[in-house]
């Protein structure tokens, strides 16, 4: 069985995990971007009161 036949028969089994990994990577990068914005935002700049939970998690 050649590599071309293997890819032709099992392309779904190759592309679905690759798509999941790529989506996971993009989601993590987007979270980093939003976290950087949150840390600079005027809304979240105040000091938290004692025993107060953060509003973002």
From Swiss-Prot:
Stated family: Belongs to the complex I NDUFB1 subunit family.
Short name of any one Pfam family annotated for the protein: NADH_oxidored
Gene Ontology CC entries for this record: mitochondrial inner membrane; nuclear speck; respiratory chain complex I
Subunit annotation: Complex I is composed of 45 different subunits.
Superkingdom of origin organism: Eukaryota
Physiological role: Accessory subunit of the mitochondrial membrane respiratory chain NADH dehydrogenase (Complex I) that is believed not to be involved in catalysis. Complex I functions in the transfer of electrons from NADH to the respiratory chain. The immediate electron acceptor for the enzyme is believed to be ubiquinone.
Chief place of localization: mitochondrion
Name this polypeptide is given: NADH dehydrogenase [ubiquinone] 1 beta subcomplex subunit 1
Topology of this chain in the membrane: Single-pass membrane protein
Keywords carried by this UniProt record: Electron transport, Membrane, Mitochondrion, Mitochondrion inner membrane, Respiratory chain, Transmembrane, Transmembrane helix, Transport
Regions crossing the membrane: 10-26
InterPro entries: NDUB1 (IPR012575)
UniProt keyword Transmembrane present: yes
Localization of this protein: Mitochondrion inner membrane
PANTHER family named among the record's database cross-references: NADH DEHYDROGENASE [UBIQUINONE] 1 BETA SUBCOMPLEX SUBUNIT 1
């Amino acid at each position: 069985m050649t590599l071309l036949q293997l890819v032709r028969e099992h392309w779904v089994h190759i592309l679905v995990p690759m798509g999941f990994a790529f989506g996971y990577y993009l989601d993590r990068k987007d979270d980093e971007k939003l976290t950087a914005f949150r840390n600079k935002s005027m809304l979240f700049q105040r000091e938290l009161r004692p025993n107060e939970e953060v509003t973002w998690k």
